[in-house]
Amino acid sequence: MKKAILFFLTFLFITRESIVAQRFLADVDSSFYIKDTVRPVIKRFANLRITGYIQPQFQVASANGIESYEGGSFSAHSQSRFMLRRARVKIEYALPSKTSGNPAAFFAFQVDGTERGVAVRDMFLKLFETRKNKFSFTAGLFGRPFGYEVNLSSAYREMPERGRMSQILMPRERDIGAMVSFEPMNKKNKLSNFKFDLGLFNGQGLTGSTDFDSRKDLISRVYCKPYELNDFSISGGLSFLNGGWKNGTKYVYKNGVGQNGDAIFIVDSTQANIDEIAPRRYYGADIQVKKEFKWGATEFRAEYWFGTQPGTSSTSTSPGVLPVANGNPLPTYIRHFNGAFFYFLQNIINEKHQLLLKYDWYDPNVKVKKQQIGKPGTNLTPADIKFATSGIGYIYHLNKQTRVILSYSMVSNEITAMPGFASQLSDNVFTCRLHFIF
């Protein structure tokens, strides 16, 4: 009974500390670095953390059965739904260092349980260099170190979902791999405000159970942590991904120009294309600016990606398995893309009320435009259509752990010559979410 009471008291102490601890995927809970008079009393559980959050929500779409990136597509005969978007529990353990106040090792395990099933979201080990406290090594299943929006935890993200581009190019945000990080822990170090990550990953993420080829994704990111000047702060980063996957056939489609001047896909059917690597290459830049006031804060975020993405005729989504149809590999389509995310966050009256504005776009094929898509002989498909989403939202913070989120996402698509896309689709979504974190 005594042990149970001690564990319960420790759990309460831990969760109260961790409410604002871990904002980004694969980061270490900052409360592990806190020294106080309580921890020595309950040493057995002092380095264990249990955290989590739950997001029940109700949604209404503008039509039945729409394809949506606001928590997934709707059923064919439904335009409203209750759903448990996320319900996650995370267990973390830090092994104290004998030579410094920083951990020597850190382990994290996170599961997500909803009406759609239970899945592992994080499982990784992080080892720290404890002599100069500048380097760390991470291995396992963890967040890809690319961009700001991808790495911002859904426990803290203001709008209900990440942008369409994030979900297509980086489905489920995480991957299996290993990463080296440079992040000086000593605040006196001139580079303590910078973090550099360099990792090697399978590439398929959580959408596949194993690597379907031997090609790995090299991902790197340099990030400048918030630089503060009075009530103003600015931060930003640069990201790079270099990877790809093997062609399953000799047919590789690339952008070109037809005899009549139209943008088209031209097929290369050289036998040597089989098992060659279809390039996957991303470049990204992001910036975050924040101004604090006595009654709240104003924040602006901007992020831009561009690069090359392999796919099939029907999709530009990063695959979890080798794309096939009826057991036969599909031809590869090489597209050049760009996209961006913009956030504007504004407290109203006080910190309990927050206005949200968001705009994002994803153009999967910047070489083609509008009425070119759908013309006979171009080999262009709905996978080449540009989409943009404008979102408006409101958050009411009941307390530090509970908030209500109301948002409305308005989706627009390119008007093309493609049947079904000759006008704007009706695919807007209203979301009402209750968010609780512990």
PLM region spans:
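Bacterial Sec-dependent N-terminal signal peptides
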Residues: 1-24
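Outer-membrane beta-barrel biogenesis signature
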Residues: 19-51, 62-71, 249, 401-402, ...
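Short, charged N-terminal helix-start/capping segments
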Residues: 22-55, 113-117, 214-224, 270-282, ...
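Outer-membrane beta-barrel pore domains
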Residues: 24-25, 63, 75-76, 232-240, ...
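Outer membrane beta-barrel
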Residues: 39-63, 70, 74-206, 212-219, ...
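Short, solvent-exposed loop/turn segments at secondary-structure boundaries
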Residues: 208-213, 418-422
